[in-house]
């Protein structure tokens, strides 16, 4: 995968438009989770250090396209950036006709989704974005799977289109895990339904040596192997699909599970051998023996991809399986990559972030990349690099 990288470019005196993913939660005009802003800071600082006139753009929320809405304004993000950078970051609302930014200065453009044609990737709007800059930098991996004006269209028309450090690091990490992974490779894919992760399971079954499944997905594989799952969430119409995947790759199944009679924070947890699961039991986590078995597989792996907690870890009594696997990944010498919202929450809960090789910032984009799909915003950078 060959793209131009912002870090390799001479930006002195250049007008640089950086597309970041600053779509953060805001309450009462204050940013409540700053992870995405923090992730963007090194790119912004590097562009400033290189002497560029920096313009940053992003979307926030889902406003009606072409209409301003105060609740989707990037004003709280501009305020946050001003504090984080120790300098004023003006929010510019009217920028499509041109903006006066001096080298070494920075402005934040108002929500790109206030512009008509953004979602539809209209060429006219994309050309207006491109006219604002000498260099366009795509740094928002989380939106790379969407072909929109500020992620894809502008890259077609800008004089130079490059990947920012955040996007480049993401592509390098995913390429390392999926392109030619060090073997043996283990993948953990968990979630409520096989149907929503079918492409991920099929794609990974072709490259990994051990495909560990969890959650409702594991229940479907258990049922497909003839094991009782009680009243657990599973998909009876996908049993043949589960068998077909298990025929292609080793899918180690739980030997014991943690069950309850109800799905509730106060539910009583009971460990049972898989054969002893009763008709009124719900499987809500893998059992301790299974967790130990899976942990051994992970510790002997050279590449690990993790997407999804293996139990209802939000309730502590059903969190042991996810905790044990998280710690095994942290202790492993393998190259490890993790992605997906629930996965990130589990990583936070068990404090293993520092010991995972790479944590992906993109939910949908991460999954689409794992599925083997082309990400439009990356594809256009590749085609521009070849030109």
From Swiss-Prot:
Residues annotated as binding substrate: 21-23, 36, 59-62, 113, 146
Gene Ontology molecular function: ADP binding; ATP binding; phosphoglycerate kinase activity
UniProt-annotated location(s): Cytoplasm
Database matches in SUPFAM superfamilies: Phosphoglycerate kinase
GO cellular component, one term: cytosol
Origin: domain of life: Bacteria
GO biological process, one term: glycolytic process
Key words, A-Z: ATP-binding, Cytoplasm, Glycolysis, Kinase, Nucleotide-binding, Transferase
Catalysed reaction, written as an equation: (2R)-3-phosphoglycerate + ATP = (2R)-3-phospho-glyceroyl phosphate + ADP
EC number assigned by the record: 2.7.2.3
Family named by the database record: Belongs to the phosphoglycerate kinase family.
Subunit field text: Monomer.
Protein name per UniProt: Phosphoglycerate kinase
Organism: Pseudomonas fluorescens (strain Pf0-1)
């Amino acid at each position: 995968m060959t793209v131009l990288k912002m870090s390799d470019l001479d930006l002195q005196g250049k007008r640089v438009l950086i597309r970041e993913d600053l779509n953060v939660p805001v309450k009462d005009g204050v940013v409540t989770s700053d992870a995405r802003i923090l992730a963007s800071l090194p790119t912004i600082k590097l562009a400033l250090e290189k002497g560029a006139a920096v313009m940053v753009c992003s979307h926030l929320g889902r406003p009606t396209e072409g209409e301003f809405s105060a609740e989707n304004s990037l004003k709280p993000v501009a305020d946050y950036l001003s504090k984080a950078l120790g300098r004023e970051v003006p929010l510019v609302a009217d920028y499509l006709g041109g903006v006066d930014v001096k080298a070494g200065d920075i402005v934040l453009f108002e929500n790109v989704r206030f512009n008509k044609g953004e979602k539809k990737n209209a060429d006219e709007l994309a050309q207006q974005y491109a006219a604002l800059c000498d260099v366009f930098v795509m740094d928002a991996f989380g939106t790379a799977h969407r072909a929109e004006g500020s992620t894809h269209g502008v890259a077609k028309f800008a004089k130079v289109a490059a990947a920012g450090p955040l996007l480049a690091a993401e592509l390098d990490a995913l390429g390392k895990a999926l392109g030619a992974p060090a073997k043996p490779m283990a993948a953990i894919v968990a979630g409520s339904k096989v149907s929503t992760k079918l492409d991920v399971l099929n794609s990974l079954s072709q490259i990994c040596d051990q495909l560990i499944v969890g959650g409702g997905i594991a229940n479907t594989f258990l049922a497909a192997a003839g094991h009782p799952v009680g009243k657990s969430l599973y998909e009876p119409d996908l049993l043949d699909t589960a068998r077909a995947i298990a025929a292609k790759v080793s899918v180690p199944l739980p030997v014991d599970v943690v069950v309850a009679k109800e799905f509730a924070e106060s539910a009583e947890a009971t460990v049972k051998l898989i054969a002893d699961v009763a008709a009124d039991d719900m499987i809500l986590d893998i059992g301790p023996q299974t967790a130990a078995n899976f942990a051994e597989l992970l510790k002997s792996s050279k590449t690990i991809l993790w997407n999804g907690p293996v139990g209802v870890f939000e309730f502590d009594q059903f969190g042991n399986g996810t905790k044990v696997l998280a710690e095994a990944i942290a202790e492993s010498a393998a190259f490890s990559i993790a992605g997906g919202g629930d996965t990130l929450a589990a990583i936070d809960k068990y404090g293993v972030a520092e010991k995972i090789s790479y944590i992906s910032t993109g939910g949908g984009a991460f999954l689409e990349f794992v599925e083997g799909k082309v990400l439009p915003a990356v594809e256009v950078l590749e085609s521009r690099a070849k030109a």
